[in-house]
């Protein structure tokens, strides 16, 4: 535990604190206020956009099958290809991030995603639906990975778990809402049109709130040599939070290394000695949970139907699985500060093994199958599907400010490529086999639990240490 608590040690021991330290220290000293809570909720709505865009795939596979005459050949086009578009756009975003405003990239992505979701009710053929899903998925790649670097850089150290937890809770509501709406609309021929409206209508709400409530990241502004803009942003946040501390003098932010060119380190810096180990660990920590996330969001309703469940029951069990993530993410949010990111990730991933086993063998229990599956779904929902507050924040904390956006986007690219493209493509032919379907997820989750604990370092409260050293504070060079 001393390793964890060391992350909260003040930086005043520095002989001459740099501008990065002073800015970070000032942000951490702003008392948590209604403004901070509003900021967290607005970023959480971005999570709703992500959750709705992902979870709607499973609903569309069922609800649009009759009205649009979807065939088995259309499944990869609705599941794999849009996710491949997300991966491609995340990678493009990783090249642009750190160089351009995280907020502006996020706004672009939100508008594109919600616009094409809003157009889904107009689809008259399977090809039109597929095209809209692919175009909307391009926006997801720009919007979603930006939220965690922004949250990590705006929130005081002790409240980053607050952001991560609320963000993931709002995201989880989309996964609970979609199967529930699918259950209600299961026999409505226009069900696939109606179910797209909540995600599409967010176009008129979320971008407006982000524009007026979420500031540019002052840490990013300072990393680009804009000390005056960084100080102005911090002082704006101080005023919005009640003005409880003194304003920040822009002059103090020029301390430390010269920023004449404000040149960014190259993308290759993510793989240099001293950073490579933490890049790999940060990327790997989210892959297992992302595989489970996408498999269940995309294929679970269809898999349960293929395994003999009624359409309404398949939606009901899927909704139960994601409903369990609401208390699960609160628990993970508490644990990630109490016992650290790494031990929390281990708990969340290994804790899912019993639940996945129960879901895999539920079909063997006769009349008790629904009960056994429900127990397994509750366990799995409260563990691996609730791990994202820890895994995503841990990923963002692996990188210094000048690499954070690109590093986080890289992690999201790899996780979504493996979880949202490769895994569904490989498992889609076997959705009728409970042992193969759930057993494959179990193996991936069990293997992925160990790298952060064995090779990673604790990062709680060490964002400025990462900014100085390029690796989590106290970590030896690779």
Predicted regions and their residues:
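Extracytoplasmic gate region of multi-pass secondary transporters
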Residues: 57-58, 271-329
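Helix-breaking motifs and short loop linkers at transmembrane-helix boundaries and internal kinks
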Residues: 69, 101, 122-128, 156, ...
